[in-house]
Amino acid sequence: MKPSPQFFLAAFLSLILQTGICYGIKWIALSKTPSSLALNQTQHCKQLEGLVVSQVQLCRSNLELMQTIIQAAREVIKTCRKTFSDMRWNCSSIELAPNYLLDLERGTRESAFVYALSAAAISHTIARACTTGDLPGCSCGPIPGETPGPGYRWGGCADNLNYGLIMGSKFSDAPMKMKKSGSQANKLMHLHNSEVGRQVLKASLEMKCKCHGVSGSCSIKTCWKGLQELRDIALDLKNKYLSATKVVHRPMGTRKYLVPKDIDIRPVKETELIYLQSSPDFCMKNEKVGSHGTQDRQCNKTSNGSDSCDLMCCGRGYNPYMDKVVERCHCKYHWCCYVTCKKCERTVERYVCK
């Protein structure tokens, strides 16, 4: 029996509900903003790529923030590529912003990581910009209430995490709070993962100190609260990516909640990344599912990790090639005070997947 038009319509609507495309990370396209765009007038906000209406409005009312947010978008791309350089999915599709492939358009494990990282990055970059004096609307973070130990004193300029979280979340969460921003399940998932990113950022705030004293004795330490580098935050989020939980949107009482798919009904943990759609293995190129494949990717023959030739090449084998490396050698220290080196060339064997 031939399926009816109503069947195809229902299937189409079901697909929309499953994928639930959301615009939450399209702002990463700000990384492509030309340096020639001064961003000193409100009409410039309309020229920025990847923003929804509410983000354009935030741009107009917070022009001084936009260069910092543009820098955050660039940091997201650089950090994601570096963090996943040894994995089959190497975050290369993030550079297609705002026109992502399905690996980031659907509610996948990969999109969970990018949402978390982008939320952490924008707050991190704003908090640091306050410290360096790049933003007129904020300054150093507050001095902690607790008394430091003997030989320590509060000073320096703390990263303004509170301001970074407030302004960063206003901007990065704005698309998910629109009425037309995909299915309710996807909005809940993206907001959850963004909050996980900010939690990891908050947990990275640590005491940093500088020594003072006669002849380097370090008799007194001036300390402040500072955030870890974004690359360290990304590594924590990568571990959460590897252990992410698949969820479903299930009725519980009078409302629907995201709950783990394969576990007895329980609330989703606030500290775990979650996803709705399973990902492919990313072995073969298939743009329909956002997979670039691993053909011609470099692999490590001696590694036991994710960059090993066995895992990276998905059992297809690999080809060796010789690569010339130029490096500094025969370095000498000269009094006083400089070092001279020669340049040496050596040949190393590398491997790429078939």
Swiss-Prot record:
Superkingdom of origin organism: Eukaryota
Molecular function as annotated in GO: chemoattractant activity; cytokine activity; frizzled binding; protein kinase activator activity
S-S pairs: 80-91, 130-138, 140-157, 209-223, 211-218, 283-314, 299-309, 313-353, 329-344, 331-341, 336-337
UniProt entry keywords in alphabetical sequence: Developmental protein, Disulfide bond, Extracellular matrix, Glycoprotein, Lipoprotein, Secreted, Signal, Wnt signaling pathway
Keyword Lipoprotein: yes
Matching CDD domains: Wnt_Wnt11 (cd19343)
Lipid attachment, kind O-palmitoleoyl serine: 215
Reported modifications of this chain: Palmitoleoylation is required for efficient binding to frizzled receptors. Depalmitoleoylation leads to Wnt signaling pathway inhibition.
GO cellular component, one term: extracellular space
Keyword Aminoacyl-tRNA synthetase: no
Main location: secreted
PROSITE patterns: WNT1
Tissue specificity field: Expressed in the dermatome. The expression domain is mutually exclusive to the other Wnt genes.
InterPro entries: Wnt, Wnt_C, Wnt_CS
Segment forming the signal sequence: 1-24
Glycan-linked positions: 40, 90, 300, 304
GO biological process, one term: skin morphogenesis
Location of the protein in the cell: Secreted, Extracellular space, Extracellular matrix
Transmembrane residue ranges: none
Family as reported in the entry's similarity comment: Belongs to the Wnt family.
General function of this protein: Ligand for members of the frizzled family of seven transmembrane receptors. May play a role in the formation of dermal structure, both limb and feather buds. Is likely to signal over only few cell diameters.
Protein name (record): Protein Wnt-11
Gene: WNT11
